[in-house]
């Protein structure tokens, strides 16, 4: 059996509205559970693929500042 975690996560969140996406992110961060990390990674990938270069630069700058 070939299980693709990314596809499973996408199938689970496909069609989510803005409030549902935010609730998913907030819940994942507040729970602090490592099992939520793949889902956040998929959400990040979706965001990244839909950003222009300026948005990507701003995001990387914000993350970099947050890591200081």
UniProtKB/Swiss-Prot annotation:
<comment type="similarity">
    <text>Belongs to the SspI family.</text>
</comment>
<dbReference type="GO" id="GO:0030436">
    <property type="term" value="P:asexual sporulation"/>
</dbReference>
<keyword id="KW-0749">Sporulation</keyword>
<dbReference type="GO" id="GO:0030435">
    <property type="term" value="P:sporulation resulting in formation of a cellular spore"/>
</dbReference>
<dbReference type="InterPro" id="IPR017525">
    <property type="entry name" value="SspI"/>
</dbReference>
<dbReference type="Pfam" id="PF14098">
    <property type="entry name" value="SSPI"/>
</dbReference>
<protein>
    <recommendedName>
        <fullName>Small, acid-soluble spore protein I</fullName>
    </recommendedName>
</protein>
